Amino acid sequence: MNKEFEKRRRVLAKMIGKDGIAVIPTAKTRVRSRDTDYPYRPDSDFYYFTGFSEPDAVMILAPGREDGAFIVCLRAKNPVTEIWDGHMEGLNGVKKNFGVDQSFKIQDLETILTSLFLGRQKVFFTLGQDDVMDKALMKSFNDVRAGQRRGGVVPSEIQALEPLVHEMRLKSFFFLCVD
């Protein structure tokens, strides 16, 4: 595991604070022609924090969490898919090779988000890039807010993540160019 990715996550965690949570999905595969996909390229922001380059994955950063702040939801290993698309890390491989604290199946994303939103005041996410991801996040956000009457802290806002991430990436680029 590259320590640079870990350092970037620590910086982002400081920026969003212990009352915030960041959600960063990766890019989807793009169909080229019926059963042929374009070569896969992960979302730049997702890769900047994880170093992980499989499709159908979401990084969640929840600072101060007892079970670890770095969570990834991804596809489970599938031998048939690996024949066509190549090696898959799977739930255990992503923990071992990328320093993930906890990993879950991507199918459980809404449930995971709903539980992680409890006790947080702000959700950092970039809306408008993926309708399916937007709907999943908004459903979890609204489910948690609907249960607010039971007490406890729940998110009151969704803030754009891009300005924070791009400021970090700009500074990283600047320091690389100064050498």
Predicted regions and their residues:
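A composition/biophysics-driven feature that prefers long, compositionally simple stretches
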Residues: 1-179
